[in-house]
């Protein structure tokens, strides 16, 4: 059995330390007020039982709370008073050096919480450690100077989650859609160097990767680009190749027919596309940003976004090459082909690629094969998105999410045209719906009252996020605000006008709708009797955002929070506050957003149809998924799922498993086992290897694919996922 020290290090539980601390306090009071030795042992026994039953490693503060409760329950109030005073004095001493222990533990690589915090960061790498060090300082400044005490308290108790405090000290935003078209067509500046319009597709791809890296270093959330912005440069290369080929033919005196000429040109164009796509794939996964990780970038593939038929045909060539290269994968250090985490791919299902016999159906088949092997692309239904994203003129719009799932709301620029690229999200605060339910004791009236109170708490926290960005000068991130990624502001100009009137969004996140409904109704939200309550909760969130937006002209929107590592924190806080409640707080995780619980048996088609109603009520972003077995030999079934997505839900993804053991060469599913301390570990089913450094494991955790492992809460959630097909 293990516990988590204040530094985050995981150590073996030692009952002697607890009994010694109690005896020290006990020895300082009058004999008549002292605990008996048998009482001390009983208190320690009870604590040990509580640690075993908790299902996760308790931290030192939890243990000390149990000690206080145990002493009080035995009526030794004088002893308790001394113990509490001792604890308080040490707390004051620690406040003098608020970050030292955390920073030292992550540098010494024994901080268990940091090791499992981010499934795309390797905490043993010095560049990642530098980012974590800066993050600890930022969190400390945020807590002590930037947040109200009650918001800090609510965050600590898992009532809300104030996201990305490790970057909040700086004036940084969350995620965005990069206006690659403006930067490539009109030129940009990167690190003080003027970059003109590229003269070939491969050069455009190379510049795009430099832009991606620069943007990633100036924000903490994900970014998205569209291949449509690269497509015009295919024809730029084509014309250049035609001129070169013509000169070569003239110089050699060869007799070439027009068909042969066209063939020669198109082969060279395809080679150019292959090189350009390869540049993006390998640059993205090998680049290291100032965040200590590869850029969190999404590549959008949408045929109907093209401006003309030539551009659409060229875009199809690029999409085909992207899918072929991702299907192949990338090699790990052992030379085995594996699934890369980035870039995330999104493929739009539309009327000319979803029906058999349609012009681009072959691309959808290739996408299906790629998903079956590599878990991407994910899918957006143009049909459903046009129904849901209606602008002020009454027109539907189709556009990418920012990163993994955060969606902008429809917006028309000053000329009355829809605008999406160049817009961004200001940040997220998430409400723990499970805590609202448990705090109400099951009383509907009290639930509604508490929900409104907690929403107002989130509102205040979101205002703090918004106000942190107010007054930010464009000089803070020239690539974003001055050189086209998001805007073309002047030097020294503030970004304030981009924070209002719908240009950017700010997100009210929510988590645990499933457990919230189960506590309040005794049933899953998939049950027809419980579903109306679940929908009413979602409507209440949207009504709050609408009210705030109308009053402040800030675009608040409801967001289905992915909770990568926070799921574990919320679960631990719920157990501490309410104990273990079957079906509600009995796991080390809570369910993401509106999702059906991972253990509930439901088929893929029913799950997607059911969740589509809730996705509609998460306009600020959400994604649904289905868990499927190895589908590489059943592509028709994947195609059936894609058609169902097209007709029923705006945004969805398929989760498969594609792992590799470097010790024995096993390819398949690396499994989750339990060690002697009850801790979940990864295990090769072939050679029983437990060394995470010698396994390549890829799992979807929050819209992105994670490859650096997860905390105990998320690992339990991954283990308990049932197949939907």
Briefly describe each language-model feature range.
Residues 89-502, 523, 527-690, 696:
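Conserved catalytic cores of very large enzyme subunits
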Residues 13-15, 422, 698:
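Non-cofactor substrate-recognition interfaces
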Residues 273, 281, 519, 714-719:
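Metallocofactor- and cofactor-centric catalytic cores in central/energy metabolism, strongly enriched
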Residues 38, 57-61, 504, 528, ...:
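Short, solvent-exposed positions on alpha-helices
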Residues 686-725:
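Long insertion/accessory domains within large nucleic-acid-processing enzymes
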Residues 1-110, 719-724:
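Charged, amphipathic alpha-helical regulatory modules used
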Residues 232, 506-519, 539, 700:
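Contiguous, well-ordered alpha-helical segments that form the cores/surfaces of helical PPI scaffolds
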């Amino acid at each position: 059995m293990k516990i988590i020290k204040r530094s985050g290090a995981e150590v073996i539980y030692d009952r002697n330390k607890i009994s010694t601390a109690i005896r020290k306090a006990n020895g300082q009071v009058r004999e008549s007020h002292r605990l008996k030795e048998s009482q001390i042992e009983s208190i320690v026994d009870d604590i040990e039982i509580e640690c075993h039953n908790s299902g996760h490693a308790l931290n030192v503060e939890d243990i000390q709370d149990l000690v206080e409760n145990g002493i009080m329950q035995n009526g030794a109030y004088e002893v308790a008073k001394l113990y509490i005073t001792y604890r308080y004095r040490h707390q004051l001493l620690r406040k003098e050096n608020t970050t030292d222990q955390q920073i030292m533990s992550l540098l010494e690589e024994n901080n268990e919480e940091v090791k499992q915090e981010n499934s795309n960061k390797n905490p043993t790498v010095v560049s990642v450690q530098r980012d974590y060090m800066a993050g600890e300082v930022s969190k400390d400044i945020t807590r002590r100077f930037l947040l109200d005490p009650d918001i800090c308290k609510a965050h600590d108790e898992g009532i809300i989650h104030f996201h990305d405090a490790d970057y909040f000290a700086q004036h940084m935003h969350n995620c965005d859609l990069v206006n690659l078209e403006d930067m490539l067509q009109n030129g940009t500046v990167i690190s003080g160097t003027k970059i003109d319009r590229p003269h070939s597709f491969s050069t455009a791809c190379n510049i795009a990767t430099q832009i991606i890296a620069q943007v990633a270093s100036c924000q903490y959330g994900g970014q998205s680009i569209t291949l449509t912005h690269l497509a015009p440069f295919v024809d730029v290369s084509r014309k250049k190749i035609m001129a070169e080929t013509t000169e070569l033919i003239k110089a050699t005196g060869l007799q070439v027919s027009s068909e042969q000429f066209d063939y020669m040109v198109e082969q060279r164009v395809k080679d150019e596309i292959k090189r350009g796509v390869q540049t993006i794939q390998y640059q993205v996964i090998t680049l290291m940003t100032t965040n200590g990780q590869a850029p969190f970038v999404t590549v959008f593939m949408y045929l109907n976004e093209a401006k003309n038929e030539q551009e659409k045909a060229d875009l199809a060539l690029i999409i085909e090459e992207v899918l072929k290269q991702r299907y192949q994968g990338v090699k790990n250090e052992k030379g085995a082909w594996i699934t890369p985490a980035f870039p995330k791919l999104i493929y739009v299902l539309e009327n000319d690629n979803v029906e058999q016999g349609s012009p681009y159906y072959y691309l959808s088949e290739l996408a299906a094969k790629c998903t079956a092997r590599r878990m991407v692309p994910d899918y957006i239904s143009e049909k459903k998105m046009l129904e849901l994203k209606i602008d002020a003129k009454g027109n539907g719009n189709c556009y990418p999410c920012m990163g993994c799932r955060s969606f902008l709301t429809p917006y028309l620029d000053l000329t009355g045209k829809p605008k999406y690229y160049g817009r961004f999200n200001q940040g997220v605060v998430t409400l723990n719906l499970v805590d609202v339910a448990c705090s109400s004791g099951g009383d509907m009236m009290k639930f509604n009252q508490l929900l409104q109170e907690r929403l107002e708490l989130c509102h205040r926290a979101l205002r703090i996020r918004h106000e942190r960005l107010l007054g930010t000068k464009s000089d803070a991130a020239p690539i974003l605000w001055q050189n086209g990624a998001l805007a073309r502001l002047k030097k020294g100009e503030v970004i304030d006008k981009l924070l209002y009137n719908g240009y950017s969004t700010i997100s009210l996140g929510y988590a645990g709708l499933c457990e919230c409904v189960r506590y309040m109704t005794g049933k899953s939200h998939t049950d027809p009797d419980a579903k109306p309550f679940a929908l009413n909760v979602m409507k209440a969130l949207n009504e709050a955002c609408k009210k705030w937006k109308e009053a402040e002209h800030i675009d608040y929107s409801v967001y289905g929070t992915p909770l990568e590592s926070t799921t574990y924190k919320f679960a631990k806080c719920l157990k501490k506050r309410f104990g273990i409640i079957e079906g509600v707080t009995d796991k080390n995780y809570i369910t993401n957003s509106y999702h059906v619980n991972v253990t509930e048996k439901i088929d893929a088609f029913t799950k997607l149809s059911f969740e589509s109603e809730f996705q509609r009520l998460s306009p600020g972003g959400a994604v649904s998924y289905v868990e499927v077995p190895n589908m590489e030999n059943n592509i028709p079934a994947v195609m059936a799922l894609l058609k169902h997505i097209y007709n029923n839900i705006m945004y969805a993804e398929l989760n498969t498993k594609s792992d590799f053991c470097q010790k024995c060469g096993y390819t398949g599913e690396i499994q989750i086992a339990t060690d002697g301390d009850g801790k979940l570990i990864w295990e090769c089913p072939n050679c029983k290897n437990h060394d995470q450094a010698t396994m390549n494991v890829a799992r979807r955790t929050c819209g992105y694919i994670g490859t650096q492992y997860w905390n105990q809460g998320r690992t339990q959630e991954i283990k308990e996922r049932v197949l939907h097909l």
